[in-house]
Amino acid sequence: MRKASLSRKTNETSVHLTLELDGEGTSTIETGIGFFDHMLTLLAKHGGINLDLSCDGDLEVDQHHTVEDIGIVLGQTLREALGNKEGITRYANVMSPMDEALSSIAFDISGRSYLVYNVEGLKEKVGTFDTELVQEFFQAFASNAQVTLHINLLYGVNSHHIIESIFKGFGRVIRQGCSIDLNQKGIPSTKGSL
């Protein structure tokens, strides 16, 4: 079973997260940020991962610490759940539509942290959610999961739809990249490690 649990406590947040890679897409998510809970629920569902997440953050300041710290812990938990990465597919890419919005998401479980984020034109907020935090979340995730992640918005108008297309696509690349390739023997790298 590819599963991991981690907790992280700072003066700003207290995050507890359990991730099961080979799940059914079930989730229990409590971040205190309704829109972010919705996006993480979509991530779990479309990623086919079971995600149990709670965060008590300093939302009286703003949402930044909560969103970033969840990205940190999710990245660390994914890295731990993957173990030595033997037999994984490693690479994944999807085109993710949501009504008028279309995003391209590419993923490499490379052992190298890198984010390319080309998303322009988001409104400042969706509800009470600060949309600039989407990039902060993915930067924290990529850095701590040690993956390469490319997120490109091809087009879109509605900020909710754009962000939703990104999170659904992100779930799908996690599912594909972390899946076991029965034809892959050992670590999927000529270096012998990831």
UniProtKB/Swiss-Prot annotation:
Main EC class the enzyme belongs to:
lyase
The organism sits in which domain of life?
Answer: Bacteria
Query: One matching Pfam family, short form?
Result: IGPD
| Catalysed reactions listed for this entry | D-erythro-1-(imidazol-4-yl)glycerol 3-phosphate = 3-(imidazol-4-yl)-2-oxopropyl phosphate + H2O
Pathway in which this enzyme or protein is active: Amino-acid biosynthesis; L-histidine biosynthesis; L-histidine from 5-phospho-alpha-D-ribose 1-diphosphate: step 6/9
Tell me the protein's name.
Imidazoleglycerol-phosphate dehydratase
Q: Name one GO biological process term.
A: L-histidine biosynthetic process
Question: Where in the cell?
Answer: Cytoplasm
Query: Which terms in the Gene Ontology molecular function aspect does this entry carry?
Result: imidazoleglycerol-phosphate dehydratase activity
Q: Give me the Gene Ontology terms describing cellular component.
A: cytoplasm
Keyword Amino-acid biosynthesis in record: yes
| Keywords annotated in UniProt | Amino-acid biosynthesis, Cytoplasm, Histidine biosynthesis, Lyase
EC numbers listed for it are 4.2.1.19
Carries keyword Cytoplasm? yes
Question: What InterPro entries has UniProt attached to this entry?
Answer: IGPD_sf, ImidazoleglycerolP_deHydtase, ImidazoleglycerP_deHydtase_CS, Ribosomal_Su5_D2-typ_SF
Similarity comment: Belongs to the imidazoleglycerol-phosphate dehydratase family.
Q: Read off the HAMAP family from this record.
A: HisB
Cross-referenced PANTHER family: IMIDAZOLEGLYCEROL-PHOSPHATE DEHYDRATASE, IMIDAZOLEGLYCEROL-PHOSPHATE DEHYDRATASE HIS7
